[in-house]
């Protein structure tokens, strides 16, 4: 039996009628604002080539580890879901993979994935019945037909979604050809890149040596000398800035930073290149490089983002077959007070540096992160991230950080997604949750409704633009 697909207009608003009325009014002031997406992982090739998405499976399921990690947890092999492996494309029939998702939609009840999907199904594709085993083929065929129309090309959807800016994330070894192609095409959509140097910083990364070699080829620098290696970073950062980058991104296992002497940094770098190094050496080098990146950001103005605290590729067997980013990353406890101190001792009072810190360890919100961001001028708090970008996670973030850091030491919302069509849904959830949180403060006479309206607009639009320097002219890096 098919069930109607309902998107309740009051979803995620407070249950109390009076507070809900306030939330409705606050949400009304932000629901139609343009989307600022300053950090994410969509594929720039989509917008460069503007080719049609092939089918529902390749659009929704194959790129979204939120979906297939849940299915995998219930015993569904990834090779039945359209997920590519190291050996090449998935052998799965896209329709059969879609049927597998449809027959398991009950697994997502109560999760943000269910909310995001239903938003896309209803608002973007106009479905009025839920996805299920019975409706799988109907969905697959209607979505497939829609994707062949010009209105569902990547650029048309970008414009339909009212996206003002979208940032992708690339490695220093990426030649940025897709960003160059976008600019050469004359398209007016603003898609920028962000500098993610992990593959040439993390000596424990499986592609470290190959990435380092490519790094040298792209820059013409001797990247096996410390000075040449740092100069290669400066050169690639400048190239990324030419493609609109305003930020860097660092996905280290911990938030550790270091401030070594020049001699010690050079010696550590030589040790890593010899391949005779310990995990502690690799960790110290990552820590030193966060400080080096901060130093470069003082010169070129790029905002730093630190996304620490994930045990990457926890499932060794899955990693061996499928590689990274396949739903097997697990949050860990993360220290910030001690870990960030070397960087903060060096640069914490600089007005020209901005560092946005994220966490997967919610226990650190009130104890460490809010007090740090509530003191150091360089620090801002990134929003609830990854495992916590759910309604409950967003509420916990506001409840545990606002009393110490306020709203204006945060940076608004990041969707941080590979799933392009979910971007409006994710921003809508964030706007509804913030409207509800602010409505409660108004109902408790802790905030005027005028101030709440202003704050809601800032959280949805102004703060991300300000935090990521999206209205500032590009800065010319100082000569090395």
UniProtKB/Swiss-Prot annotation:
Gene this protein is translated from: uxaC
Q: Which UniProt keywords apply?
A: Isomerase
Answer yes or no on keyword Chloroplast.
no
Q: In which pathway does it act?
A: Carbohydrate metabolism; pentose and glucuronate interconversion
Identification of the protein by name: Uronate isomerase
UniProt EC number: 5.3.1.12
Hey, which family's this protein in? Belongs to the metallo-dependent hydrolases superfamily. Uronate isomerase family.
Q: What biological-process GO terms show up in the record?
A: D-galacturonate catabolic process; D-glucuronate catabolic process
Q: Which reaction does it catalyse?
A: D-glucuronate = D-fructuronate; aldehydo-D-galacturonate = keto-D-tagaturonate
Report the Pfam families cross-referenced here. UxaC
The entry lists its GO molecular-function terms as:
glucuronate isomerase activity
């Amino acid at each position: 039996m098919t069930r109607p697909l309902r998107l309740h207009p009051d979803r995620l608003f407070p249950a109390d009628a009076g507070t809900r009325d306030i939330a409705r009014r606050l949400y009304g002031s932000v629901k139609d604002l343009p989307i600022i997406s300053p950090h994410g992982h969509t594929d720039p090739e989509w917008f460069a080539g503007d080719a049609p998405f092939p089918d529902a499976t390749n659009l929704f399921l194959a790129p979204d580890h939120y979906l297939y990690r849940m299915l995998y947890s219930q015993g569904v092999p990834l090779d039945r879901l359209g997920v590519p492996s190291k050996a090449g494309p998935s052998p799965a029939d896209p329709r059969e993979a879609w049927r597998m998702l449809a027959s398991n939609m009950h697994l997502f009840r109560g999760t943000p994935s269910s909310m995001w999907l239903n938003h896309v199904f209803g608002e973007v594709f106009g479905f009025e019945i839920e996805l299920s085993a019975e409706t799988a083929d109907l969905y697959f065929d209607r979505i497939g037909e829609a994707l062949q129309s010009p209105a569902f090309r990547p650029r048309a959807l970008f414009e339909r979604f009212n996206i003002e800016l979208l940032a992708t994330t690339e490695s220093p070894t990426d030649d940025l050809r897709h960003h160059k192609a976008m600019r050469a095409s004359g398209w007016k959509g603003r898609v920028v890149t962000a500098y993610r140097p992990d593959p040439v910083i993390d000596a424990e990364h499986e592609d470290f040596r190959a990435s380092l070699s490519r790094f040298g080829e792209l820059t013409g620098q001797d990247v096996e000398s410390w000075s040449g290696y740092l100069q290669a970073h400066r050169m690639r950062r400048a190239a990324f800035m030419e493609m609109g980058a305003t930020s860097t991104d660092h996905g280290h296992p911990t938030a550790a930073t270091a401030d070594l002497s020049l001699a010690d940094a050079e010696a550590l770098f030589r040790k890593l290149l010899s391949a005779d190094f310990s995990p502690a050496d690799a960790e110290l080098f990552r820590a030193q490089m966060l400080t080096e990146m901060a130093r470069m950001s003082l010169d070129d103005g790029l905002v730093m983002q630190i996304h620490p605290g994930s045990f990457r590729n926890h499932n060794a067997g899955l990693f061996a077959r499928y590689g990274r980013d396949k739903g097997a990353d697990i949050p860990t406890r993360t220290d910030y007070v001690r870990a960030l101190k070397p960087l903060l001792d060096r640069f914490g009072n600089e007005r020209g540096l901005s560092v946005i810190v994220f966490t997967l360890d919610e226990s650190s919100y009130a104890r460490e992160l809010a007090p740090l961001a509530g003191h150091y001028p360089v620090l801002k708090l990134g929003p609830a991230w990854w495992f916590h970008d759910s309604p409950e996670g967003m509420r916990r973030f506001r409840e545990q950080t606002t009393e110490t850091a306020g709203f204006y030491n945060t940076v608004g919302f990041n969707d941080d997604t590979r799933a392009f069509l979910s971007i409006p849904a994710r921003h809508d959830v964030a706007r509804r949750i913030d409207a509800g949180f602010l409505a409660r403060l108004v109902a408790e006479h802790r905030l005027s409704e005028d101030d709440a309206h202003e704050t809601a607009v800032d959280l949805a639009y102004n703060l991300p633009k300000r935090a990521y320097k999206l209205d500032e002219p590009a800065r010319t890096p100082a000569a090395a």
